């Protein structure tokens, strides 16, 4: 992989990781356009490293939430002993509940080989971009009824986690699934988006650890000095771009909603489908 390919793919990852347009789908399309072999061991390592870089931007932007113990008094009307005990670390407890469904479904998909098959299919990406785009045109009217005082509860966290399971299908978008899941549970767009960011950290960190384990136990011939430098460059680029994209996205979503993202998804998906139907090669690089 060249330096230019590294930078382009990392920018795409950073821009799309937290937008409801499917970062995985865009990565697959971009790699095909640039002629990057998706089944290559180094490309696999590069993919999860730059995703990890993007996820680190959440911890950086919201570090006060991730490294803060709640010392506020337990609500006077709280009678559950367990909730009283976990009150100082309730933030982490909600993330644990939210990530459970994805862990179960993700491991099942990986063990069955379904995940690898889905990740190699540009058709799946294109179709899901269109389907998700159509849904997003109407989701504001369906779910935008949240009130600012709404809080993430254990029940809501688990429900959002179930929505996140849809993102195992490339082109669906983890961000879209979790934000819509939050709105469906009565949260505002801003509150739902922030919890989506938070939930991405344990979800993607867990996936990165699994991928890293598989990689370290496999063929290490790809780990040349050049490739390791490309990994470092990609991680830094995706981190910076994701940080900027995330700050912009929260304000844009609160003001304009999902409509423009929906149209974008539909346009990109239709273009890819037309190219596939007409046997137009996606590979722009010989």
Report residues per predicted region.
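Multi-pass membrane proteins that catalyze or facilitate reactions on polyprenyl-/lipid-phosphate substrates
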Residues: 1-286
